[in-house]
A protein has these predicted regions:
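Solvent-exposed, well-ordered loop and adjacent helix/strand elements within mature globular domains
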Residues: 1-112
């Protein structure tokens, strides 16, 4: 059980801890499953975190919370094992502010 940003306890199936990065995409882009990228969608290695999984992502040190989101894209660095997830943001500035952080990715519900 983890406690989300609202203070509510939540159960999860499993968690992964490691580096996460951020990305954004130009207008008209689509994710690897054909969805329009948006805040709340993240890129993962679908062999570790299935597409459609409901996730909750927060910093190991508690300094940053991405919150509840869905595994909706494939991340090249995630496929290589370099990161756990690539978090979508609307702007380059938001991505730069996030940078690269050690995060806990809670898999609340695996898959669709």
């Amino acid at each position: 059980v983890f406690t989300d940003a609202s203070g509510a306890p939540s159960s999860f199936e499993y968690s992964l801890t490691g580096s996460c990065t951020a990305y954004y995409a130009p207008a008209g882009a689509v994710t690897s499953i054909g969805a329009t990228p948006q805040v709340g969608y993240v890129a993962v290695d679908p062999n570790r975190i299935p597409y459609g999984s409901l996730l909750y992502i927060t910093a190991v040190d508690g300094s940053w919370t991405y919150g509840y989101c869905y595994a909706m894209d494939t991340g090249g660095a995630a496929m290589c094992g370099d990161i756990v997830a690539d978090l979508y943001y609307d702007t380059l500035e938001d991505c730069t502010a996030f940078g690269r952080r050690d995060m806990i990715v809670y898999v609340v519900r695996a898959g669709w």
